Amino acid sequence: MKREALIEGIWERDATTWTGSDEAHWLGWLDEPLHVQEGLEEIRRFAESLHDEVDDVVLCGMGGSSLAPEVLRRSFEVDWFHVLDTTHPKAIRALEEKLDLERTFFVSSSKSGTTLETRSHTDYFWETGGKRAEMFCAVTDPGSELEHLARKRGFHAVFAGEPSIGGRYSALSPFGIVPAVLMGVDAAQLLERAREMREACRSGEGNPGFELGNRFGTGWHEGRDKICIGSTYENRGFGLWAEQLIAESTGKHGKGLIPAPGQPADGAPDRQAAGVDIPEPYALGAEFFRWEFAVAVAGAYLEINPFDQPDVQAAKDKTNEVLATGKEPDLELQGSIDELLAEAQEGNYFCIQAFIQPTPENDRLLGEIAGRAETAGLLVTNGYGPRYMHSTGQLHKGGPNTGLFLQVIDDPGDELPIPGKPFGFRRLIQAQAAGDLETLKERGRRVARIHIEEAI
């Protein structure tokens, strides 16, 4: 498809630009920088009402509901804003110990309103915080289970998402803007940058979004399916968000672009470098939109629907099956790092899936594992579970069978009960680890499971 026709097809909401299925129903993100501006004053008043009552804010969310806020938190250096997207009991306890719950505000964020982790976090802090409805708000799509819960409990506020926007395209919707305003970010300036980029992405020539997507798509056709996303102090955290956008949008039907934040291209024949243009934090508004447009363009090159996620549910179903047994999963160790590396072939990548407590020390240990794979000539991606299941999980199951998957586990510690559930966070994260590895094996993926102590 020619440049002009592809760009026009996107703006005309023409599903035949991709596969001719339901793509036209998922293009609300194209206009959201205009629409969300209309509700900005209400969001500002809400945030101002909390100023004297709140010391910390905790966002409970996964995937598209958490990654844009995490990028904003890091970029604007807001240390009192916390993103909770782990089910590890030790991590949840560690966060709770930092907080004065009487002066902590909770944002429960989920488009579907049924995200298991988000609901579990919300219910946990609802109970431990004394059921103080004025210290909770929800961001969710209209009519969702979470909206009904929030209104039943009398949450301080409920902000509605736009149903025609998928989670990974929601950075410039209330899912990104409500947290931004709570952080004290000038959301009007963020959105102004996004609108400027939106206008630039309408043109046939000098279109920043098309140019980036064209590089992605052309590179894929030439065998360069791995996207090395530049990492600098200024764009810290952006790769986490871009990783989900690329992986979940393109990794399906045996195809896919493999995002690798912070990895070097080094002239490797299967890699391409992608620069990130964020000279200062407010440039995120433009960059969010540019990358969304680019990935929509790349989807046309790959001839896939960049707005669905057909393989994400499989691991969730496996997790639920494990939980339904009522027993603690037996996470038997399988294989080793060396055995997994021995299976590497040309064009493969090494993926670390860490169901362990996110800490600086564990970051270091995972870095040592990554170093071994890099020494073997492999590109490395890594993520903490269950965060990555809502980000790159679609690519792992639905993309090309070129990954070597190393699951890393630890001892999650004592059980931490989830109110209203027959299981706690310990059993939940173990079930997620068990379910994800089993799903990968069913898809014919090469896998191993080790304990983090093996990296010491």
Predicted segments with their positions:
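Low-complexity, highly charged intrinsically disordered N-terminal segments
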Residues: 1-57, 67
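Acidic catalytic cores of enzymes that act on phosphate-bearing nucleotides/polynucleotides
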Residues: 28, 32, 91, 185-191, ...
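Glycine-rich phosphate-binding loops that contact phosphosugars or nucleotide phosphates
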Residues: 48-204, 271-281
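Generic beta-strand/beta-sheet core signal
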Residues: 60, 84, 109, 139, ...
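Catalytic-loop motifs flanking and including active-site residues across diverse enzymes
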Residues: 68, 170-174, 242, 289-293, ...
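A short, gly/pro- and small-residue-rich
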Residues: 121-130, 422-423, 430, 437
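C-terminal amphipathic alpha-helical interaction region
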Residues: 342-347, 351-352, 383-386, 426, ...
